[in-house]
Amino acid sequence: MFRTTKRYFCTSFNRRKNVVVIGGGHAGVEAAAAASRLGAKTTLLTKSFDNIGQMSCNPAFGGIGKGTLMREIDALGGVVSGVCDESAIQFHMLNRSNGPAVWSPRAQMDRSVFKKNMQKTISTYRKNLQVREGAAVSINVLTEDDGKQVCDSIVLEDGTAIPASCIVITTGTFLGGQINVGLTQLAAGRYGERPSLPLSKCLSNLGFKMGRLKTGTPPRLSSPINISKMTEQTGDEIPETFSFLNLERDFSPALPQRSCYRTYTTELTHEIVRKNLAFAPHMLAGDILSPRYCPSLEAKVTRFPHKARHLIWLEPEGLDPNSWWYPNGLSNSMPEEIQHNIIRSIPGLENCNIVRPAYGVMYDYVIPTQLKATLETKKIQGLYLAGQINGTTGYEEAAAQGILAGLNAGLSALGREPVDIPRNTALLGVMVDDLITKGVKEPYRVFTSRSEYRLTTRADNADLRLTPLAQSIGLLDDQTHWESFQRTKSLLDFSNKIAKEFILSPQQWSKLGMPIPNDGKYRSAWDLLSFTNLDLFCVISCIPKLKDIPKRVLQRLIIEGKYTYYIKRQGTQNKQLNCRDESTVIPSDFDFDTLHSVSAEELMLLKTIRPATIGQLKRIQGIKPGTIIRLLRHTYYNPAKEAWLRKVYMPMYDMHSSEENQSTNL
């Protein structure tokens, strides 16, 4: 009894209101900043302050799906979006030829400026955030009287222990990292930087199921480069920023803008790769998977032998005339001398120099089905994971996880209730739900196509979806962000109201140049926004009361009006699909052993993942519809519900059983 009480006063008091974030990458920075903004005393532990803001791979943020994450991070008060806007040397909105639901902002960075701006931003968090240099080697965990495991402290290389009730691990590719250049293997998490080997062993010893993934980065090039042999791509004249605060302002880029250039590999390139595959063991490690949507050059050549060429984007890494170039699409792990031959076989790069060779990197990760929706581990209270340690790839995915893990660590340290973000609220919620219910077999990359709610979780409306939440929990660091949001929302609400009140007959609309059916039906301007044959800005320009509304607000109004019908249809479809599953909670202490006629494989999945809702249960790969019915019976039962369940799920179950029988017969 005395030891328990003594332990409480010696450790629990010191750990209270204390968050330690391990790793100063994109996930770590967002986690530390989020916890700090909430008011929790936070320590950001990094091997070197000079490496905060380091962009390990490509010099760009955003892209398809990723741009939406960047807007969501900003809507939650994150730091990276604003830093990107101030460090960008090209802004480009992707997917303009498609619908607004998949428009994706992207921006090219000046590496050195981004790094400087990020370090400057973190330095402003002086009230609650301390940046400390050091390397964590282990985590001390206490087992309380009820058997629950809780975080106690982290231990540094020099033996120093830092008390912490909440720990966020964001180690990126450093966890058990090994880089490969040809047959040369080095223990490293990034070129020239030591990996975190003891921490990986510690997590394994704590009982976490671990896996191993791989990725790679292309060589860095320097002049002379012959851009006359390439196709130039300029940025947008009017930049679409990541930060909503900058969208509201008359934003002008802080830096001069630069172009990117397009070139291609050749048959000679592919022949060089094929002849030297034996010297790329990184590629040959088939049991360790690399990103499907960012394949290495070796993977592209072997997977698509019929293709005569592959696209290469040459991206500037900065404004300095001596800045390096990043050949996006040339990731590989060939020996350096082979890389020189590859580069010389590509139009425009025949005479350039390799200043840093391409390399592959293998690293450990924690199987993410061991996490809650808050990114807290199920095994240890107060331990959170974010970024590549969860099996994802990409700056944006890491930063988004970082802000979620950091805010929940901060809330926990302050004794407040946790926050999770559901699938229907944000693309961040889709990513986290995919990770914790499905797990990963290859590095996970966000796409809008992964979301069944992509019409409502767009890049343009991330503030409407998430900023009120951020304000309610104290995640916005000052009132500027909130006041900007309120102004925008007020203008949107006003514009929406006026558009719905502006009602004319077909003849009146025709006189204004709007060819609509002459059916005698009066229609509002809002109704006309769903017409595909009209210039929607011309429709809005017909409304006198909206003449002074900023174009950016009118653009958002048009998007909402354009998608109204489709959003309603999406809602109906998802309601039918989900069958109220997201709100049907499975008790956290439910004993899955009480379920009958459940396979051993399913039982193992249920015990490992412990789904929180029926919605999560349905998304677990390997769970049969019949098992869903049985679990719903145990969750709550009434005869009417039983009949409904059989009507909805049994056709699926019968089809599933039929397919199984067919495969058995084969």
Curated annotation (Swiss-Prot):
Known role: Component of the MSS1-MTO1 complex that catalyzes the 5-carboxymethylaminomethyluridine (cmnm(5)U) modification at the 34th wobble position (U34) of mitochondrial tRNAs.
Protein's GO biological process: mitochondrial translation; mitochondrial tRNA wobble uridine modification; tRNA methylation
Transit peptide: 1-16
Source organism superkingdom: Eukaryota
UniProt keywords, alphabetically: FAD, Flavoprotein, Mitochondrion, Transit peptide, tRNA processing
Signal peptide residues on this chain, from the entry's feature table: none
Primary location group: mitochondrion
Cofactor(s) named in the record: FAD
Entry-linked Pfam families: GIDA, GIDA_C_1st, SAM_GIDA_C
Intracellular or extracellular location(s): Mitochondrion
Name of the protein in question: Protein MTO1 homolog, mitochondrial
Any GO molecular function: flavin adenine dinucleotide binding
Family affiliation: Belongs to the MnmG family.
PROSITE patterns cross-referenced by the UniProt entry: GIDA_1, GIDA_2
Organism: Schizosaccharomyces pombe (strain 972 / ATCC 24843) (Fission yeast)
Binding-site positions, FAD: 23-28
Any one Gene Ontology cellular component term annotated for this protein: mitochondrion
Family matches, as NCBIfam families: mnmG_gidA
